[in-house]
């Protein structure tokens, strides 16, 4: 825990009736950012943005230091009301045993009319994959590939058009660089 008011900060957002889930700013032990929100479509399904930036850096247009809406946040530190969790069926543990169950949960919340908030004022250190391990065996790689296919089939429209990410930016990396070729086609002038 970095900020002792982390829970108060997260609960203050989660209690708002229009909010489905709240995520925190998570740091690696070397004080670089691990989680600053999730962007859909990056690397095929979703990825954390601002990964690796140093403490004190504002990120792309200040997004690493501003409370904002996202399509998803990590469940590594997630606060939500029980009624929100149960109303969308909770985590899909059958098809998403390890990866993307948090993204799936957040998308179900958005589909039900709720919003997802990320706050930089709830800060903690996160030891990524310490409990679940890495996808470094054939069995884990197969499971990971099945989870990717499931997400791409279920949420294909969302993964190509995240409303909280500029469509002029690439889905190949999480560095906010321009997409080339452009993801948006030229609009007719009529």
Predicted stretch roles:
Residues 1-46, 95, 115:
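Conserved donor NDP-sugar-binding/catalytic core segment of glycosyltransferases
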Residues 5, 17, 100, 104, ...:
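A general alpha-helical scaffold signature found inside nucleotide-binding enzyme cores
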Residues 5-10, 64-89, 94-125:
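A short, conserved alpha-helix in the catalytic core of glycosyltransferases
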Residues 11, 37, 106-107, 148-152:
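Non-transmembrane alpha-helical segments in soluble domains
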Residues 13, 17, 29, 112, ...:
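Phosphate/oxyanion-binding loops and surfaces in catalytic or ligand/nucleic-acid-binding neighborhoods
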Residues 22-25, 119-120, 127:
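Short glycine/serine/threonine-enriched helix-capping/active-site loop
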Residues 30, 42-70, 79, 116, ...:
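C-terminal, non-catalytic tails of nucleotide-sugar-dependent glycosyltransferases
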Residues 125-131:
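Short acidic (Asp/Glu) and glycine-rich catalytic loops that position anionic groups and cofactors
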């Amino acid at each position: 825990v970095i900020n002792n008011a982390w829970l108060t900060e997260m609960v203050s957002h989660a209690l708002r009736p229009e909010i489905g889930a709240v995520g925190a700013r998570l740091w690696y032990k070397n004080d670089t950012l691990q989680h600053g929100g999730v962007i859909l479509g990056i690397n095929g399904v979703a990825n954390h943005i601002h990964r690796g930036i140093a403490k004190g850096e504002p990120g792309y247009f200040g997004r690493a230091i501003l409370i904002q809406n996202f399509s998803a946040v990590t469940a590594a530190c997630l606060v939500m009301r029980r009624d929100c969790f149960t109303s969308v069926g909770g985590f899909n543990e059958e098809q998403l045993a390890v990866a993307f169950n948090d993204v799936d949960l957040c998308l179900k919340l958005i589909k039900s009319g709720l919003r997802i908030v990320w706050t930089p004022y709830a800060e903690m250190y996160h030891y990524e994959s310490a409990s679940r391990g890495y996808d470094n065996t054939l069995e884990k790689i197969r499971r990971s590939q099945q989870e990717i296919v499931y997400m791409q089939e279920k949420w294909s429209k969302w993964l190509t058009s995240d409303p909280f990410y500029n469509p002029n930016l690439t889905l190949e990396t999480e560095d906010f660089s321009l997409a080339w070729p452009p993801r948006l086609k030229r609009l007719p002038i009529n």
